[in-house]
Amino acid sequence: MSLFPVIVVFGLSFPPIFFELLLSLAIFWLVRRMLVPTGIYDFVWHPALFNTALYCCLFYLISRLFV
């Protein structure tokens, strides 16, 4: 059970996990933007798989904060 109630915006109801997804997406964009200039993607075998795993890890950490 999440700490936040269902949020209604302009008649549309959003579950609390929706905002956790958006927050983790914003953090993912920031982390990815910091990782690209470092050249870490040169050592990554499959960049799309790396990005997916990074997003999943960030979402897990964010969702653990709100439980």
From Swiss-Prot:
Keyword rRNA-binding applies: no
Signal sequence extent: none
Keyword line: Cell membrane, Membrane, Transmembrane, Transmembrane helix
A cellular component term, taken from the record's GO annotations: plasma membrane
Any Pfam family matching the protein: DUF1656
TM segment ranges: 3-23, 43-63
Membrane-topology descriptor: Multi-pass membrane protein
Principal location class: membrane
Cited InterPro entries: DUF1656
Subcellular location(s) per record: Cell membrane
Top-rank lineage group of the source organism: Bacteria
Coiled coil: none
HAMAP family linked to this entry: AaeX
Family, similarity comment: Belongs to the AaeX family.
NCBIfam families according to UniProt: PRK11594.1
Name of the protein in its database record: Protein AaeX
